[in-house]
Every structure is written in structure tokens, then in C-alpha cells.
Amino acid sequence: MLIDFNKEVASSVNNSVLSENHPAAFISSQDDYLSKQLRGIDFTDKDKTWHFTSNGRFALHDILIHIAARIEGMECIVTSFNLSVIAAKLFIRAWDTGLFKSLSFILNAQKRHNFEDAVKLIDGKFPMIFTSIHAKVGLLWNENHFITLVTSGNLSNNNNIERGFISTSKDVFYFDKMWIDGLLNRNAKQD
């Protein structure tokens, strides 16, 4: 169930770290579908942050694709420790249906052998670099929207509890865009 901390406090979450200046939402592990949970969030609201847990019901790729389906013309860069075949297929389907204007991946080089089948699916379709990375970040943007997704979950589904937040703050977006662009620029110089 989606709970706005400004209106109601979830008994399972200590809200003492949340101020009234930072609206948040909690996505409970009892919820059925990601789309049901995210339906109440207006990603066009500027400078908002929503916090969530997943309990294995959705992953980084699921949220990115869901948001891209709601806001047209989104560009996307995603970083992850790994990539599953399912996530790769979902990104390809989303791309083929026009959900993304651009889509790039930054993936962990040391663990690449663990997800080589997924890499083969997207190789040549999307820009992809491999480096030493453990961060799981998704950036979505167009001329009017700047959305950041940071989560403990990778581009793979598991039944573990994952935690993260979604922000529509331009400052948060550019904080992550700056270090991600640094990785992309460093990789371009090595090629």
C-alpha cells in the first residue's frame, strides 16, 4: 500500500528521519503490482522524493520502464552490478515500443561473466560500458523532467528485500549525472 508520510505514518517505518520538507512514500511488501503502487505518484511533481522497499516484487529495471511508460521521450542511463536475461529482454521490448529516446548501461566488469547471456542480448543495441561499479542508479530525463532512482536492487529480480528512493529533484539528478558522465568520459578516452 502506498503511504504518504505527510498524511500517515507507516507503523513499520521509523519516520523520525523524514522531515515535512521531504514528502515520501512507502511501498509495502504486501502490495500486488508495481504499477498499482506507483500509480499514485506524480513523477511530474518537482523536488519530491519517494522512499520504497520491494521485498522482491520488482527491481531497478521494472521501475525505470514503468516511469518511462508514463512520461514520453525519456532518456535513460542505468548502472548496475549485474543484468539478468529477463531485464535485458524487458529493456529491448521497451526500446522497440518507443519508451526510451536513448538507453545506456554501465555494468560491473568483474562480474560480467555471470551475466554474459544478458549482455549478448543487448550488445550492439545500446551503448554499454564495463567498469568497477556496485552502485544501482537509474537516471531518466527529458527537457522537462529529471528523475533519479537509487536502489539496493540490481537489474535482476530476487526475493530479497530491496530499499531505495525515487527523486524528481534536479539537484539530486545532476549529482548522479556528474559522476556517471565522468565514467562515460573516462571510458571514451580509453577507447
What is each of the regions a protein language model found here?
Residues 1-191:
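PLD/PLD-like phosphodiesterase catalytic module centered on the HKD motif
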